[in-house]
Amino acid sequence: MAKATGRYNLISPKKDLEKGVVLSDLCNFLVSQTIQGWKVYWAGIEFDVTHKGMALLHRLKTNDFAPAWSMTRNLFPHLFQNPNSTIESPLWALRVILAAGIQDQLIDQSLIEPLAGALGLISDWLLTTNTNHFNMRTQRVKEQLSLKMLSLIRSNILKFINKLDALHVVNYNGLLSSIEIGTQNHTIIITRTNMGFLVELQEPDKSAMNRMKPGPAKFSLLHESTLKAFTQGSSTRMQSLILEFNSSLAI
């Protein structure tokens, strides 16, 4: 009896790319619009980014909030009560998280040049611009970055996402709820909230936290759903998150 098969189907480009990341994947932050928000492709990884939670962030910043939310404003005064702070899009939040993941690798591992230098440049590009393409001019970098190295970078980014997943929602028990990474020009703080991850970018000296004369800060919210697909044992983790839900936290 005849049966249908897919024996000679072409391998989709996406599956093919999963075997290894090429340099161009690290230097392209490809964005397409969706009904819920955006689809982002970077380093062989596809992210679904949503607008969820952003309206609430704007309300907290502009005083248009319920009295019960005042604790959240007081917990992050350098963001919600600082005239020098600005709200960015969730796409920006994802870029900062990816840049932080790269910086985490540079801190954790003794990477050889030119790999460390190249990663530093890619991290700066993600952190300080909103462009979709970074032109890596150095030929030496291109020659020495093997597929194995690039795939290692990708797997380390996924490990960093799991580090974020291991954080607890902001709590009263002293459990770890934030990751902080300092670079030469910035301080990145990523905090676990009920909705996902509150991402902030400050000056190296964290002057935004100076109550008398607050310095500049940028911040945004990346919804839980964007990173959920890349976390290990996410169903168990989701159950524990429900248990530690902080009802007094607006976001």
UniProtKB/Swiss-Prot annotation:
Outcome reported for the amino acid change (mutating T187I): In strain: Isolate guinea pig-adapted
Assigned GO CC terms: host cell endomembrane system; host cell plasma membrane; membrane; virion membrane
Top-rank taxon, per record: Viruses
Gene Ontology terms: biological process: symbiont-mediated suppression of host innate immune response; symbiont-mediated suppression of host JAK-STAT cascade via inhibition of STAT1 activity; symbiont-mediated suppression of host type I interferon-mediated signaling pathway; viral budding from plasma membrane
Effect of V170A: Complete loss of interaction with NP
Membrane topology recorded in Swiss-Prot or TrEMBL: Peripheral membrane protein
Outcome reported for the amino acid change (mutating L147P): In strain: Isolate guinea pig-adapted
Quaternary structure note: Interacts with host importins KPNA1, KPNA5 and KPNA6. Interacts with host STAT1. Interacts with host KEAP1; this interaction activates host transcription factor NRF2 by blocking its interaction with KEAP1.
UniProt similarity note: Belongs to the filoviridae membrane-associated protein VP24 family.
Function noted in UniProt: Prevents the establishment of cellular antiviral state by blocking the interferon-alpha/beta (IFN-alpha/beta) and IFN-gamma signaling pathways. Blocks the IFN-induced nuclear accumulation of host phosphorylated STAT1 by interacting with the STAT1-binding region of host importins. Alternatively also interacts directly with host STAT1 and may additionally inhibit its non-phosphorylated form. Plays a role in assembly of viral nucleocapsid and virion budding. May act as a minor matrix protein that plays a role in assembly of viral nucleocapsid and virion budding.
Name of the protein in question: Membrane-associated protein VP24
UniProt lineage: Viruses, Riboviria, Orthornavirae, Negarnaviricota, Haploviricotina
Name of the coding gene: VP24
